[in-house]
A protein has these predicted regions:
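Conserved ABC ATPase signature
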Residues: 137-141, 145
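The feature captures the beta-strand-to-loop junction immediately N-terminal to the Walker
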Residues: 40-42
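Conserved beta-strand-loop-alpha-helix hinge in the C-terminal portion
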Residues: 213-237
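Conserved ABC ATPase "signature" region
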Residues: 115-133
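Conserved ABC transporter NBD signature motif
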Residues: 63-74, 79
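Helix-to-loop junction immediately C-terminal to a conserved catalytic motif
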Residues: 55
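Catalytic Walker B motif of ABC-type/P-loop ATPase nucleotide-binding domains
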Residues: 162-166
Length: 275
């Protein structure tokens, strides 16, 4: 399994009219080693920024991010061969007219024989129940079908790590269950953000992100309870991170998180080989 490490990584951006940069992600030191990791939080909390650090789509303003010792800035090609990324909006990464062509494009670098490439593409599409739709225009597919196609195209090249940004957002109940079963059967390390708290409960470890900071890191049940408490208190994405850092709140239960200010109140288109 891949070892992903953030060492004092932070993301800041300049904003016109503001004397100081806007902080998208507070400085964070953490190791991501579990098989299935989730990131939960309100819209705008910093979930996507954190995920995009993991394969070099976002460059840290300070600190470093490494995947198996490969730096995401200096060795971005090596990182992207290992880390597959699925966006919330599948049209951000589906670039061919049909699903068949898109999956075959993903395989082009690793599978040189056209017949074998076609066979593997069909096998991948069938795995997701998409083979009957393989030759339809991607614009004729539903949002959920496009999302499954984007996932299929990334998995076709067998990345070591699969990063998914809110993968169930566009899926109906049937396809959400298909997604959950598919993820459960994968050998890859999975790191995903989600608003689907039932999906979060399937994971090994969950981080709660609020206002650009990780405010909880631990088991899924405790993390979901923590996030629900933030939402009930009206704190999520509105300064809860500052509240969570005040003295007297218990520390995160996860020993991988190394942030002395992180405490909790006791209560988750680039393809591998393409650049």
């Amino acid at each position: 399994m891949s070892a992903i490490a953030l060492d004092r990584a932070a993301v800041r951006v300049a904003v016109d009219g503001r004397p100081a940069p806007k902080i998208l992600l507070e400085e964070l030191t953490v190791r991501l080693t579990e098989q299935r990791i989730g990131i939960i939080g309100a819209n705008g909390s910093g979930k996507s920024t954190l995920l995009r650090l993991l394969n070099g789509l976002v460059v840290p303003s300070s600190g470093t991010v490494t995947v198996d010792q490969w730096d995401t800035v200096r060795s971005v090609r090596e990182v992207r061969r290992r880390v597959g990324f699925v966006f919330t909006d599948p049209l951000s990464q589906l670039v061919m007219p049909t699903g068949r062509e898109d999956v075959e494009l993903s395989l082009r670098r690793s599978v040189k024989n056209a017949r074998e490439r076609s066979r593997q593409a069909e096998e991948t599409l069938d795995r997701f129940g998409l083979l009957p739709l393989a030759d339809q225009s991607i614009y004729e597919l539903s949002g959920g079908e496009r999302q499954l196609l984007a996932l299929a195209a990334v998995l076709a090249v067998d990345p070591e790590v699969l990063v998914l940004d809110e993968p169930s957002t566009l899926l109906d109940l049937r396809n959400r269950e298909l997604l959950r079963r598919t993820l459960a059967g994968l050998s890859q390390q999975i790191i995903l953000s989600t608003h689907d708290l039932e999906l979060a409960l399937d994971l090994d470890r969950v981080l709660v992100v609020d206002a650009g900071a990780v405010v909880f890191d631990g088991g899924p049940a405790a993390a979901v309870a923590h996030y629900r408490a933030l939402c009930a208190a009206g704190l999520a994405a509105s300064g809860a991170a500052a509240d969570a850092a005040r003295p007297g709140w218990p520390h995160s239960e996860n020993p991988h998180l190394e942030n002395p200010g992180l405490e909790n109140p006791g209560l988750a288109p680039q393809r591998p080989g393409q650049l």
